[in-house]
Swiss-Prot record:
One of its GO terms (biological process) is defense response. It comes from the Eukaryota. Expressed by the skin dorsal glands. GO terms for cellular component: extracellular region. This is Uperin-6.1. Keywords: Amphibian defense peptide, Secreted. It is found in: Secreted. It comes from Uperoleia inundata (Floodplain toadlet).
Length: 30
């Protein structure tokens, strides 16, 4: 349903945010 779609979208957003932060720690430019 809608709640599931929103929830999974938020999870993906959180994951990409974590990946960005991790990359920053490692010194990647993006």
């Amino acid at each position: 349903g809608l709640a599931g779609a929103i929830s999974s979208a938020l999870d993906k957003l959180k994951q990409s945010q974590l990946i960005k932060n991790y990359a920053k720690k490692l010194g990647y430019p993006r």
